Amino acid sequence: MILHAQAKHGKPGLPWLVFLHGFSGDCHEWQEVGEAFADYSRLYVDLPGHGGSAAISVDGFDDVTDLLRKTLVSYNILEFWLVGYSLGGRVAMMAACQGLAGLCGVIVEGGHPGLQNAEQRAERQRSDRQWAQRFCTEPLTAVFADWYQQPVFASLNDDQRRELVALRSNNNGATLAAMLEATSLAVQPDLRANLSARTFAFYYLCGERDSKFRALAAELAADCHVIPRAGHNAHRENPAGVIASLAQILRF
């Protein structure tokens, strides 16, 4: 079994760019940014429980990494960068720390490196279980209306929230809930030490209005790029800013 993905081919000899979306997104999420790099072959992946991979369920990050590895092999991707937002960034960091043959580097936008104590994990588990229950039982428009009121999305205006609620409500609530719990921060290890000892290039992107993740970025041994005029979802709020950072990273 492999993950559903859309592949766009570029020039031979350059590494692939493999894009991983955030929670409730899909393979289209990164395409406005990715298509600015047409010289590179691009793979836009649907993570388990999402988009064309909605029917694929996992028990945890190990399963996601295994599926990602098999997907890369199926596309004969031998050299690549992982580019991930939020959940996709956490998947990218986990997979990279576990080891992926051919990995050039990881570019993470607003991805959490992991909670650092049992109390934080227990609180996150309670929160994610409550959200998962709502995703399973309530209309998605109602759940996402509340989801985008969370502090991390404080930089969004009302129009942006309405647009995201409409977009995300096309998902399958039950499969979102399953993926939310399988990849919860409550079950993700703290990756700070592994990332400090890494053998791959590591870059971190965060919006200038995303104070939480700017603080987290400062804790990481990563080259950090702050995206102007953006909050947590920087590639949606300022795609040109993210394109500029990726171009600098890739020496485009």
UniProtKB/Swiss-Prot annotation:
* GO terms for MF: 2-succinyl-6-hydroxy-2,4-cyclohexadiene-1-carboxylate synthase activity
Cysteines engaged in disulfide bonds, as pairs: none
Q: Which reaction does it catalyse?
A: 5-enolpyruvoyl-6-hydroxy-2-succinyl-cyclohex-3-ene-1-carboxylate = (1R,6R)-6-hydroxy-2-succinyl-cyclohexa-2,4-diene-1-carboxylate + pyruvate
Q: Which domain of life is it from?
A: Bacteria
Q: Which residues form the signal peptide?
A: none
The record's Gene Ontology biological-process terms are: menaquinone biosynthetic process
- EC number(s): the record gives 4.2.99.20
Pfam families cross-referenced by the UniProt entry: Abhydrolase_6
Give, as in the UniProt entry, the pathway in which the protein acts: Quinol/quinone metabolism; 1,4-dihydroxy-2-naphthoate biosynthesis; 1,4-dihydroxy-2-naphthoate from chorismate: step 3/7; Quinol/quinone metabolism; menaquinone biosynthesis
The enzyme's first-digit EC class, named in words, is: lyase
Q: Which UniProt keywords apply?
A: Lyase, Menaquinone biosynthesis
**Entry-linked InterPro entries:** AB_hydrolase_1, AB_hydrolase_fold, SHCHC_synthase_MenH
Q: Please name the SUPFAM superfamilies in this protein's record.
A: alpha/beta-Hydrolases
Q: How does it assemble?
A: Monomer.
Q: Which PANTHER family match?
A: 2-SUCCINYL-5-ENOLPYRUVYL-6-HYDROXY-3-CYCLOHEXENE-1-CARBOXYLATE SYNTHASE, PROTEIN PHYLLO, CHLOROPLASTIC
Family matches, as NCBIfam families: menH_SHCHC, PRK11126.1
Q: Which family does it belong to?
A: Belongs to the AB hydrolase superfamily. MenH family.
Q: What function does the entry list?
A: Catalyzes a proton abstraction reaction that results in 2,5-elimination of pyruvate from 2-succinyl-5-enolpyruvyl-6-hydroxy-3-cyclohexene-1-carboxylate (SEPHCHC) and the formation of 2-succinyl-6-hydroxy-2,4-cyclohexadiene-1-carboxylate (SHCHC).
Its name, as the record gives it, is: 2-succinyl-6-hydroxy-2,4-cyclohexadiene-1-carboxylate synthase
Gene behind this chain? menH
